[in-house]
From Swiss-Prot:
UniProt GO molecular function: tRNA 2'-O-methyltransferase activity; zinc ion binding
PANTHER family according to UniProt: TRNA:M(4)X MODIFICATION ENZYME TRM13 HOMOLOG
Reaction equations catalysed: cytidine(4) in tRNA(Pro) + S-adenosyl-L-methionine = 2'-O-methylcytidine(4) in tRNA(Pro) + S-adenosyl-L-homocysteine + H(+); cytidine(4) in tRNA(Gly)(GCC) + S-adenosyl-L-methionine = 2'-O-methylcytidine(4) in tRNA(Gly)(GCC) + S-adenosyl-L-homocysteine + H(+); adenosine(4) in tRNA(His) + S-adenosyl-L-methionine = 2'-O-methyladenosine(4) in tRNA(His) + S-adenosyl-L-homocysteine + H(+)
Protein name: tRNA:m(4)X modification enzyme TRM13
Record EC number: 2.1.1.225
Gene source species: Scheffersomyces stipitis (strain ATCC 58785 / CBS 6054 / NBRC 10063 / NRRL Y-11545)
Gene name, Swiss-Prot/TrEMBL: TRM13
Annotated GO CC locations: cytoplasm; nucleolus
Length: 420
């Protein structure tokens, strides 16, 4: 496999040069099966997901069982593309898209936009490295501590913002198996055992899990078991949905959880999912008619290199335009520069000077890494600008929640009524 620079692990027939998945790449550029017994058969990309292929004669059967087959959605909170745009054009600005970059090739785009990034300076963020005693046992048990340190700091900051309470319902976006929520629950139980929370109403406690993927080893049952094993009599409501955030009607999802207050959390919410999460909150009643039900938001952001220009908040696009990034093509180059922040010089790299000279930017590793962090900060600041422009009465800020040697994706976004 040229793209991955390794051999395919699948087995092939003796009469064929390629396995069934890669037979479409045979030397004749034909997708006809070379097996003489199946000479009239043909390997074709799956219409539902072109990443895999299927024998044409089996296509009808395959389409009935393909994992990419669209599922008919019946959940009341499913609303197709509800968060692609803001409701009632909230925060919309005039279309600032320009076609001025269409005629430029990639090298010219780098030449145009690298000087802009070099001219931008930000004050360093504040470090808010916190911890929670409820995760001390986990830190003592695990050999590789980077995830536990991040979880402990995030939960410590949730507590510092006065959001770690069984009066709240925690909604984890991009939850995966909901490991962060499980440790939020353990830390909350630890606080209750130490009688840190004196005034609590346990009937409002719960969790909502949102993820578009299929996840194994989910923590839902472990959260309930942790509560059963605790001396504290508490049983949280738990509701999980497999859904893309762009299709989530948040008001209808949280309605069944019967929350007193909602706290939105996530650890490493990837790329456009962060912007869609912000849109889902802005499209809900939590930041308008039911502000008293919004406790706060605390998410660790990551992967700005897979953000989408179309999914940015309108005010984010406005901010980027003011900084010189006015077009989708300019944003595409900005995203590529963002990747330099987490793909710096590798210790084992050979022929470093030649690799640097051949790079399209003509920059060395250290320069690319430095500019990558500026580019990443620019996207983050656009989100903060948008939220501050659209929300009144809320604290909006970013901070570093762990050191860079724990994770390079160490920026946390906070929105709440309590200052931090």
């Amino acid at each position: 496999m040229i793209k991955k620079n390794r051999r395919c692990a699948m087995r092939r027939k003796g009469s064929q040069k390629y396995c069934s998945e890669h037979i479409i790449y045979n030397e004749s550029s034909s997708i006809v099966n070379t097996d003489t017994k199946l000479s009239e058969d043909e390997r074709v990309p799956c219409p539902l997901d072109g990443k895999h292929t299927v024998w044409k004669k089996n296509l009808a059967v395959h389409l009935k069982k393909c994992n990419a087959k669209p599922v008919e959605r019946t959940e009341e909170w499913f609303s197709k593309d509800i968060n692609v745009k803001l409701k009632n054009s909230l925060g919309e600005t005039e279309d600032i898209t320009r076609s001025e970059d269409k005629t430029l090739d990639e090298k010219d785009l780098y030449s145009k936009y690298i000087p802009i990034i070099e001219g931008i300076n930000f004050e360093p963020l504040q470090y808010r490295i916190s911890e929670h005693s409820g995760l001390q046992q986990r830190l003592n048990e695990v050999l590789i501590q980077k995830h536990a340190l991040q979880q402990s700091s995030l939960i410590g900051n949730i507590k510092d913002a006065k959001l770690l309470s069984p009066n709240n319902t925690f909604v984890e976006f991009g939850c995966g198996k909901a490991e962060l929520s499980r440790f939020v629950n353990l830390c909350l139980l630890d606080d209750l055992k130490q009688k840190v929370n004196n005034e609590v109403t346990l009937e409002n406690y719960g969790y909502g899990f949102i993820d578009r993927g299929v996840n194994r080893m989910k923590m839902d049952k472990k959260i309930l078991k942790d509560c059963l094993d605790s001396p504290i009599e508490i049983t949280p409501r738990i509701q999980r949905t497999r859904i893309d955030i762009k299709d989530l009607d948040l008001d209808k999802f949280i309605n069944k959880l019967q929350p007193s207050k909602i706290v939105a959390i996530s650890k490493h919410l990837c790329g456009a999912a962060t912007d869609l999460t912000l849109k889902s909150l802005l499209n809900s009643s939590l930041l308008s008619d039911n502000r008293d039900k919004f406790g706060g938001l605390l998410i660790a952001m990551c992967c700005r290199h897979v953000c989408s220009y179309d999914q940015l908040l309108p005010k984010s696009r406005e901010y980027l335009a003011e900084k010189g990034f006015k077009t989708p093509d300019s944003f595409r180059i900005l995203k590529k520069m963002v990747s330099w922040a987490v793909c710096s010089k590798k210790e084992h790299a050979k022929n470093v000077e030649r690799l640097e000279a051949e790079h399209i930017s003509q920059l060395d590793y250290s320069s690319r890494e430095r500019l990558g962090f500026v580019a990443r900060r620019l996207i983050d600041e656009s989100r903060v600008y948008a939220l501050k422009s659209m929300l009144s009465g809320f604290e909006v800020k970013m901070f570093w929640y762990v050191e860079k040697d724990v994770t390079l994706e160490n920026v946390c976004l906070y929105v709440g009524q309590e200052p931090m």
